[in-house]
Amino acid sequence: QEGDGYISFPTIFLSLKRLVPVAEEAKIITDDTLLTQEELNEFKQLHNKILIAQTPISSATTITSKNKQSIGVSTELYDWNQNSMGQDNLGKIILALFSFKRLHDKYPRQYKGGILAIDEMDATMYPASQVELLKVLRKYASKLNLQILFTTHSMSLLKAMDDLVQEVSKQEE
């Protein structure tokens, strides 16, 4: 009701269920048409930047199962069935960012921001990729007015967060 004091924000929570291996899912539906061409290009760029990968991505396939929706990548060397858990995890996180971007673009007057919560963000990702992901999340948080919350046990990620706080503190002086 109007005046009840609650502010409504789109919210996405990425639980550890996102880490269930695709091979263990009973039923998988694939779709190559979920992303626009612009999103596909952005996904490829983000994927390789965050994972510090050089191999060109030939296609990106949306994978939907009972537990999750993610994006699998295929290259000239392997297809989406052989993606690492880190790639699968990253695909899910990027899809969440794209969901907020779609809301931002489709409802520019109504969209006020959103909340993205990620349980164990660092899971399945090596330290350098965790830091790259943090940089990308910071950029999207600013661009899309997102509050991003995550849990971690990664010392690399905690150090990167501390460095980021120090950098912001210096800018405010």
What spans do the regions from the language model cover?
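Glutamate identity and glutamate-enriched acidic tracts
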Residues: E2, E25, E38-E42, E76, ...
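Extended helical coiled-coil dimerization/tether regions that scaffold
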Residues: I12, L16-Y111
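Switch/communication elements of ASCE P-loop NTPase nucleotide-binding domains
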Residues: N81-E173
